[in-house]
Amino acid sequence: MAPKLITVLCLGFCLNQKICPHAGAQDKFSLSAWPSPVVPLGGRVTLSCHSHLRFVIWTIFQTTGTRSHELHTGLSNNITISPVTPEHAGTYRCVGIYKHASKWSAESNSLKIIVTGLFTKPSISAHPSSLVHAGARVSLRCHSELAFDEFILYKEGHIQHSQQLDQGMEAGIHYVEAVFSMGPVTPAHAGAYRCCGCFSHSRYEWSAPSDPLDIVITGKYKKPSLSTQVDPMMRLGEKLTLFCSSEISFDQYHLFRHGVAHGQWLSGGQRHREAFQANFSVGRATPVPGGTYRCYGSFNDSPYKPPVTRCNFTPQETLRVLLCHSQNPPLNLTHLALKDSPATCICSLDSQ
């Protein structure tokens, strides 16, 4: 008998005897959520059942405690929930049934749907800085005035729950916070982090997410250099421009002030004396722009485009800009550049 004919006869026998695989690992489903299982209140999410076997009836159900609620049964293997409410938070599974069989498949994996935005958002900060050299350590701190029982830190689908909470008083206001330690960091740690809070009686109902915190991993490439105007004498009110130069032709250049993005990034750099240079204008020379600046370079295959940070930056030496303010007599700013060390700005009295 031909092999194809044997296969057809065996399949027919299987269906007629209703002994096709059921409740077995080989026909177990998987359940997924698009675009994410973490959904903002009032948002939209699509749940989809997947299986390599051809089922004709699909059921998606929600489990709350020991009770199951059927959400969808039909020919379609997916359902869209919109708008999402707190009642949609919980655990979901799905099953399927053959057209000529009487038993359901095994249940799919459990999928937790989290609804965010039910409480005021916490804050998030990095210590000592969100700019972290490869191999170093950093702590992310989630902080809230609401007495949450737990904080959740997440980045692009990776979720981490707090193990311990600290409490305290600040300016007469009670707060709770959790500290998440990371390190030694690698390029995989780079990205935009957020945190949420929740209460123990409703762990699938989270607060609004914090503002994103971009963790940048530095030190992959040779560092550029940072300098200011060639003229060493600068008066208050004059235009201040910083020059970021490198031997490497980076696709983007970024300026940071006191470890925080200065709100500027430039695409590429112009060829200048055997190097590539990007020019940053930081406004007029007043006491406000003064401070410590750094510039970084990156490539398009690891772009820095706030709020998402995925790149490896190379740091340069620090440029410290010190601006002095006086109307009479006027003060001049002298800039002394030191290679591979913080540059020094010296304010001197004009002896006119």
UniProtKB/Swiss-Prot annotation:
<dbReference type="InterPro" id="IPR007110">
    <property type="entry name" value="Ig-like_dom"/>
</dbReference>
<dbReference type="InterPro" id="IPR013783">
    <property type="entry name" value="Ig-like_fold"/>
</dbReference>
<dbReference type="GO" id="GO:0002764">
    <property type="term" value="P:immune response-regulating signaling pathway"/>
</dbReference>
<dbReference type="GO" id="GO:0007166">
    <property type="term" value="P:cell surface receptor signaling pathway"/>
</dbReference>
<keyword id="KW-1015">Disulfide bond</keyword>
<keyword id="KW-0732">Signal</keyword>
<dbReference type="InterPro" id="IPR013151">
    <property type="entry name" value="Immunoglobulin_dom"/>
</dbReference>
<feature type="glycosylation site" description="N-linked (GlcNAc...) asparagine">
    <location>
        <position position="78"/>
    </location>
</feature>
<feature type="signal peptide">
    <location>
        <begin position="1"/>
        <end position="16"/>
    </location>
</feature>
<feature type="disulfide bond">
    <location>
        <begin position="49"/>
        <end position="94"/>
    </location>
</feature>
<dbReference type="InterPro" id="IPR003599">
    <property type="entry name" value="Ig_sub"/>
</dbReference>
<dbReference type="InterPro" id="IPR036179">
    <property type="entry name" value="Ig-like_dom_sf"/>
</dbReference>
<keyword id="KW-0325">Glycoprotein</keyword>
<keyword id="KW-0677">Repeat</keyword>
<feature type="domain" description="Ig-like C2-type 2">
    <location>
        <begin position="224"/>
        <end position="311"/>
    </location>
</feature>
<keyword id="KW-0964">Secreted</keyword>
<dbReference type="GO" id="GO:0005576">
    <property type="term" value="C:extracellular region"/>
</dbReference>
<protein>
    <recommendedName>
        <fullName>Putative killer cell immunoglobulin-like receptor-like protein KIR3DX1</fullName>
    </recommendedName>
</protein>
<keyword id="KW-0393">Immunoglobulin domain</keyword>
<dbReference type="InterPro" id="IPR050412">
    <property type="entry name" value="Ig-like_Receptors_ImmuneReg"/>
</dbReference>
<feature type="disulfide bond">
    <location>
        <begin position="244"/>
        <end position="295"/>
    </location>
</feature>
<dbReference type="GO" id="GO:0005886">
    <property type="term" value="C:plasma membrane"/>
</dbReference>
<feature type="domain" description="Ig-like C2-type 1">
    <location>
        <begin position="17"/>
        <end position="112"/>
    </location>
</feature>
<dbReference type="Pfam" id="PF00047">
    <property type="entry name" value="ig"/>
</dbReference>
